[in-house]
């Protein structure tokens, strides 16, 4: 603007905004170039590591053909197990299992009174799923990994009457105990347990339109455009699905589906103003750069663990922050263990885990590695010594770390991972004395059997809807439904150089992925997970919000995500997360004390839809799964919420308005809307009432030019910030901003109002169709 030039730039929003967008694009390109240049200095090291990993993989014996690298191997292993189960069920019908019948009868006589419909302690012993799920303790009643140590067997022989089950009388007789012990040793197969017949028959393949919708949502988090749909349907080639998968996985927007996943799993929790419990830096930008640059997952996880860069502007150091936390490195170890090792270590924060094998010493030894110094349990996290001295029942927990005892950095997970810390790792470390770097290597090494398997299982689960191992972040006591398939996928991940896209491609190319979904619940029992079909999945909050904007042709309308745009506060007490262009860029809008004068009303309209569908901006704890239960708020906010009302409005200059003006006929307009919103054409019965609604007045839908008046421009209001939000006018200004946000943008004056409202009703009805929020 200040450089002499012959170009005349009007000082209006329309003149300045394209210039700003061009400047942002130029700066982003420069930033990418700088990052790639710096990253290239490490390329040789990672090439060598991946070559070493492939050599190690080739040296290991395998019961399956690792060179078989196509998706047919997935379908072969799935069908092989279905066929085996069908044979077993036929044999079971011909030869009943008397031991199972006796064991289930014992449970029904002695246990179901409390652990049946009443579910005392959250434990349901009416079926095998309940047996494996456990109760409120989180521990399965039968541990299929260590059957003889199963809590069920321990409780029936306990010498303490307060802990023995059943609690009445003298407990079970010796004969009943022996039956249960033998039954658990066999795997606790239920007498009436059969795999549902539906789970033994593969579902049909999706049609092309439904496949494209599923693949596009899974790969880039958006609905396919009309043009993409039409081109795909018109393509007669046999390999068009494989080519579509390749195109989608190569799309730069592929990163946008994984960023919110890892935000949840890694508990990214940036706070716009004044850090609160477990606030982190905005390491979303580190994740975005790593995923867009297609960094192998072992590389970016290593960079995450190293926690470098500026914690307040997007560096991986932001992961290391945990505000108001008395043991932040212990918290980070808990997150890393759940994310990449399938281990739950939360209990070990204060005491040895009662239902897992990890101890306080394990957790704080790893925390010491991460912190590069000795570590200990802070006083505020200790179980008081008096607790263990209480008379009566023996406590269920132990605290093996003494008060004020410190733990040196060490790796205690050889038994879980199959990998021991040793000097043999030193050649792969630039600084063998750096315990944090050593931890990153131990975590991501191919010899760590858990890392590749956990990552492969997470990829599988995101695309299929159920894991080969459940739950994905707690493998203790669990068994895989398809162990050979899990190992094969893990090996393919290592062989690919830890490229997650390689596993996604294999899964998406399989017939399993391309089948119609089942709405049968995901069984906890691995026996029941046959994968005859993928699970029916609802869009994530991010997919939903982004698809709403994609279908209506509009971008996210939000204020800058900051309460301190003038930057007067120190960087560690305020953030600016910019203007969100994708839903994952949203964040908690809490402003310390919910001060109404600091409201961001337009951002709030987006956030309230996301929250209704399970998103949480404040991630104080990691999580893999969001709430899936139906909530009346979900249809309510799509039907009545301000965001959908604004998006379905044919606003001035919007694609919806232009479609209405350009449509040659009501039928063509309805067809176009169906393709934009539902990725298919309507049936005659579906189209008829919508076409009828648009036919009335269609030829007169455009207003005469002299009747079209320019939209009045709102008065520019002063900006309310942290620096001035306590002045009396601040609340008044914010109330007006909220009113404008709820009102939304003006309708396009070129369209006749009554016809336009009917047209908007048609758009609204498609957005509110139940199939809109479901992935096919």
Language-model features, listed with the residues they occupy:
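Structured secondary-structure scaffolds
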Residues: 426-433, 437-455, 461-463
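Long, low-complexity, polar/charged, intrinsically disordered or flexibly structured peripheral segments
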Residues: 412-428, 439-441, 737
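Extended, well-ordered alpha-helical scaffold/bundle regions in very large, multi-domain proteins
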Residues: 681-687
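Glycine-centered loop/turn motifs
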Residues: 144-145, 402-404
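Short, structured secondary-structure elements
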Residues: 2-3, 47-133, 157-163, 167-169, ...
């Amino acid at each position: 603007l200040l450089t002499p030039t012959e170009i005349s730039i009007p000082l209006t929003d329309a003149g300045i905004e394209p210039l700003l967008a061009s400047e942002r694009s130029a700066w982003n390109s420069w930033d990418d170039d700088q990052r790639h240049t710096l990253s290239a200095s490490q390329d040789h090291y990672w090439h060598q590591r991946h070559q070493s990993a492939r050599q190690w993989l080739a040296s290991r014996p395998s019961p399956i053909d690792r060179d078989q690298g196509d998706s047919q191997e997935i379908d072969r292993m799935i069908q092989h197990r279905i066929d085996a189960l069908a044979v077993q069920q036929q044999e079971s019908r011909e030869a009943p299992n008397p031991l199972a019948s006796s064991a289930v009868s014992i449970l029904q006589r002695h246990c179901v009174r409390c652990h049946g419909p009443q579910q005392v302690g959250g434990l349901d012993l009416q079926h095998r799923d309940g047996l494996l799920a456990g109760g409120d303790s989180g521990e399965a009643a039968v541990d299929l990994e260590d059957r003889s140590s199963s809590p069920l067997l321990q409780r029936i022989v306990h010498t303490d009457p307060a802990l023995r089950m059943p609690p009445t009388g003298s407990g079970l007789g010796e004969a009943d105990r022996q039956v249960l012990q033998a039954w658990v040793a066999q795997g606790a197969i239920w007498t009436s347990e059969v795999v549902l017949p539906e789970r033994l028959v593969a579902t049909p393949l999706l049609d092309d339109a439904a496949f494209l919708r599923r693949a596009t949502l899974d790969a880039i988090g958006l609905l396919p455009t009309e043009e993409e749909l039409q081109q795909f349907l018109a393509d007669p080639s046999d390999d068009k699905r494989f080519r579509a998968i390749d195109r989608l996985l190569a799309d730069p927007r592929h990163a946008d589906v994984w960023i919110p996943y890892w935000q949840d799993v890694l508990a990214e929790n940036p706070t716009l103003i004044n850090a609160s419990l477990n606030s982190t830096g905005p390491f979303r930008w580190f994740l975005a750069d790593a995923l867009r640059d297609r960094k192998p997952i072992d590389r970016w996880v290593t960079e995450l663990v190293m926690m470098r860069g500026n914690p307040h502007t997007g560096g991986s150091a932001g992961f290391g922050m945990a505000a108001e936390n008395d043991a932040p490195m212990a918290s980070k170890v808990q997150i890393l263990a759940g994310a990449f090792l399938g281990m739950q270590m939360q209990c070990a924060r204060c005491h040895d885990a009662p239902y897992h094998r990890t101890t306080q010493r394990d957790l704080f030894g790893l925390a010491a590695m991460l912190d590069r110094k000795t570590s200990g349990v802070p006083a505020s996290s200790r179980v008081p010594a008096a607790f263990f001295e209480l008379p009566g029942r023996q406590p269920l927990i132990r605290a093996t770390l003494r008060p004020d005892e410190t733990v040196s950095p060490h790796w205690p997970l050889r038994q879980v991972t199959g990998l021991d810390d040793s000097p043999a790792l030193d050649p792969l470390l630039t600084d063998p004395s750096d315990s944090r770097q050593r931890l990153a290597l131990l975590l991501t090494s191919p010899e760590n059997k858990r890392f590749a398997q956990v990552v492969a299982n997470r990829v599988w689960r995101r695309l299929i809807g159920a894991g080969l191992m459940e739950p994905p972040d707690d493998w203790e006591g669990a068994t895989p439904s398809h162990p050979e398939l899990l190992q094969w996928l893990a090996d393919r991940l290592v062989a690919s150089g830890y490229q997650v896209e390689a596993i996604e491609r294999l899964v998406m190319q399989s017939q399993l992925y391309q089948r119609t979904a089942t709405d049968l619940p995901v069984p906890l029992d691995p026996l029941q997970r046959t994968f005859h079909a993928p699970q029916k999945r609802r869009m994530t909050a991010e997919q939903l919000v982004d698809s709403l904007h994609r279908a209506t042709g509009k971008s996210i309308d939000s204020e800058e995500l900051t309460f301190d745009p003038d930057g007067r506060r120190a960087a560690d007490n305020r953030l600016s997360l910019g203007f969100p262009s994708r839903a994952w860029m949203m964040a908690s809008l809490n402003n310390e004390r919910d001060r109404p004068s600091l409201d961001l009303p337009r951002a709030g309209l987006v956030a309230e839809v996301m929250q209704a569908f399970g998103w949480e901006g404040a991630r104080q704890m990691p999580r893999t799964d969001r709430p899936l239960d139906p909530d009346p708020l979900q249809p309510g906010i799509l039907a009545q919420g301000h965001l959908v009302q604004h998006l379905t409005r044919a606003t001035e200059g919007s694609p919806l308005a232009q479609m209405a003006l350009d449509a040659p006929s009501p039928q063509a307009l309805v067809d176009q809307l169906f393709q934009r919103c539902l990725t298919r054409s309507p049936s005659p019965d579906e189209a008829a009432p919508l076409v009828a609604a648009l036919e009335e007045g269609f030829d007169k839908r455009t207003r005469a030019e002299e009747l079209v008046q320019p939209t009045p421009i709102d008065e520019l209001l002063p900006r309310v910030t942290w620096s001035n939000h306590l002045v009396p006018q601040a609340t008044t200004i914010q109330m007006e901003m909220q009113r404008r946000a709820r009102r939304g943008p003006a309708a396009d004056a070129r369209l006749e109002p009554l016809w336009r409202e009917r047209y908007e009703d048609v758009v609204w009805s498609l957005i509110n169709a139940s199939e809109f929020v479901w992935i096919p």
